[in-house]
Amino acid sequence: MSDTEEVEHGEEEYEEEAHEAEEVHEEEVHEPAPPPEEAPEEEEKPRIKLTAPKIPEGEKVDFDDIQKKRQNKDLIELQALIDSHFEARRKEEEELVALKERIEKRRAERAEQQRIRAEKEKERQARLAEEKARREEEDAKRKAEDDLKKKKALSSMGASYSSYLAKADQKRGKKQTARETKKKVLAERRKPLNIDHLNEDKLRDKAKELWDWLYQLQTEKYDFAEQIKRKKYEIVTLRNRIDQAQKHSKKAGAKGKVGGRWK
């Protein structure tokens, strides 16, 4: 219920109370005297003349004063309600301001923490970069010293070692050439697989074809590996036979000669 409705309700109650008081007063004034008791017929007595009792005049009820007091009371209550409302509103505004201040303070603290964290990360990255540069410099210096030592060692060695290095470089070049040739041949054999235009059946056929081809390659690889094993075994066997034959021939030659002559 609003404050205005409370005031109107209070005025209505006040008017009803005043109206009831007036009705009670009128009833007291106009109340008729009780009828006289009927005397018995046998004995007739003289009738007494009855008059309405007079109401003593006392203090008159001032309804205007009552209404003013009631209105003043209602105004005081309304003013108290208004004051309490504004007091609650003031407290809410103070709490809102305090909340905003706490939020701003927390935001500033978080920004400060992020700034400190960023500075520490920057210092860490700079320290890592310095350590990396120092290690690279030390590695380069050590490598230069090793190269200088190698050059001095090579210069102190004779031309035989230089020719040996030249031959080693030549062999390395041959190996590199053979490796490049192998890569080239494999690149020519290994053609790109174009299957974008194939449907499901053709893809299934293509997969089966590739599987068969892979199975054949694995079979050939296994056969070649077995052939290499057999060849190695045969070579080792032949070498052992040659070594045994050479040993026997040396022993037989030593026994056949006596004093540099044959027996």
UniProtKB/Swiss-Prot annotation:
Disordered: annotated span: 1-66, 107-188, 243-263
The question of whether Plastid is a record keyword is answered with no
The question of whether Nuclease is a record keyword is answered with: no
* Record's function text: Troponin T is the tropomyosin-binding subunit of troponin, the thin filament regulatory complex which confers calcium-sensitivity to striated muscle actomyosin ATPase activity.
Residues the record lists as N-acetylserine modifications? 2
Query: What are the GO MF terms of this UniProt record?
Result: tropomyosin binding; troponin C binding; troponin I binding
Q: What UniProt keywords are attached to this protein's entry?
A: Acetylation, Muscle protein, Phosphoprotein
**Basic and acidic residues bias locations:** 56-66, 107-149, 177-188
| GO annotation (BP), single | skeletal muscle contraction
Instruction: Fetch the PANTHER family from UniProt.
Output: TROPONIN T (PTHR11521), TROPONIN T, FAST SKELETAL MUSCLE (PTHR11521:SF4)
Query: Which superkingdom is the protein from?
Result: Eukaryota
The entry's cellular-component GO terms read: troponin complex
**Pfam families the UniProt entry points to:** Troponin
**Which residue intervals are annotated with compositional bias (Acidic residues) in the record?**
1-26
Its recorded name reads Troponin T, fast skeletal muscle isoforms
Mark out the compositionally biased spans (Basic residues): 247-263
Which organism is this protein's natural source?
Gallus gallus (Chicken)
Question: What protein family is recorded?
Answer: Belongs to the troponin T family.
